[in-house]
Amino acid sequence: MKKYLMLLGVLSISSCQDGTLVNEAVLIGTDTNEAATLDKSINKKAKNIILFIGDGMGPSQVELARLSVGGANHRLSFENFPVTGIVLNSSAQNLYTDSAAAATAWAAGVKTKNGYLSVDADNKFLPTIPELLSTKGYLTGLVATSSVTHATPAAFYAHINSRSKHKRIAEMLVESDIAIALGGGSEFFKMPLSNEAIHIINNGDSLDEDNLIEYSRVLGLFGEDGLDRRLSPPTQLKMTEKAVDFLDLKTANCPGFFLMSEGSQIDWAGHDNNVKYMLSEFADFDDSIAAAIEFAKKDQETLILVTADHATGGLVLQKPRGSNIRAQWTTTSHDLSPINIYAFGPGADLFSGVMDNTEIFDRMLQALDYENLESNNCIN
């Protein structure tokens, strides 16, 4: 992550309101990494899926993150994936999607209204991929740098017509089969909780406990709402590594696991029109993916997907002036850019071309050969 932060000394930060163009100067980096494209796994069933979501991560955010580190020839960890596609992301009644509707599309495979979580536009229950996979003996984990009740993680376990009902969403997480959830949101979990039913941890050092594997469920709450970086909560990298380790060990005698890990605050930086904030969050996101790649290389049975719900901020990159790029924000809201998807591992070939965001759900199940999975209970 330091390599991103060291390159931001020339940033000129200013604030804006919607409709005002904001320019920021970003130094072109020199830490070039021209790693070879990762091998493509064809016609092989995936055992596990790790889905990375860069909230608010449009193509311009990816481009700026790359250029700020190593210039035109640099590649981010996921840009070496052998398969890429384009994802269209409108919601049920709007060209403009929010995170709730987009996450419902991946989690349940159906378009819904903005603000709805895994219920359709008529407020009818939609089974999610963790719920479907749990009947086959799979375990699921969620990681976020927001509250674990925020729209993206919540869509994988909550069924409700308002993403703002955090206390009820928190209850739904406790009632769910999610094996491990790490992020913020402690202010929403005021209900009595039995440590025997779900092990609660409130500081990052607890993630290093050797006995986490002894618990059937773990809930890590490292901030009242989103993670406040000034208070040094665990990084997305650390939370992702610990979630992967936990799920890998817990499913040693089970069919597999599903993990969603979100770089939530990439979006918040876009709303703030703050390049320095965005690149810092992006660095943690990219580091998390790099760690998952190392796991997948050894495991040989894990599909890694990297995508976004939408782009935020209307970020436009203008021609360099000397060694600086001009980064221009055009809105403090989401924009209508289509977003990319990157795939590596068994089943990656299913994610090429142009697809609707609901198709990600179907293709993930296809990669796992879901129709031929037998009913199972993961006993560990």
Regions found by a protein language model. Name each.
Residues 18-211, 216, 283-286, 311-380:
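N-terminal catalytic scaffold of extracellular/periplasmic and nuclease hydrolases
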Residues 109-113, 216-229, 267-273, 342-346:
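Gly-rich Lys/Arg/Thr-decorated short loops/hinges at beta-loop-alpha junctions or inter-strand turns
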Residues 51, 220-222, 258-262, 305:
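Structural motif
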Residues 204-207, 233-251:
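A Trp-anchored, charged/polar loop motif used as the substrate-binding/catalytic surface
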Residues 151-157, 224-227, 243-244, 248-288:
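Active-site His/acidic residue clusters
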Residues 2-7:
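Sec-dependent signal peptide recognition
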Residues 14-15:
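C-terminal motif of bacterial Sec signal peptides marking the signal peptidase cleavage site
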Residues 269, 273-320:
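Extended C-terminal subregions enriched in glycine
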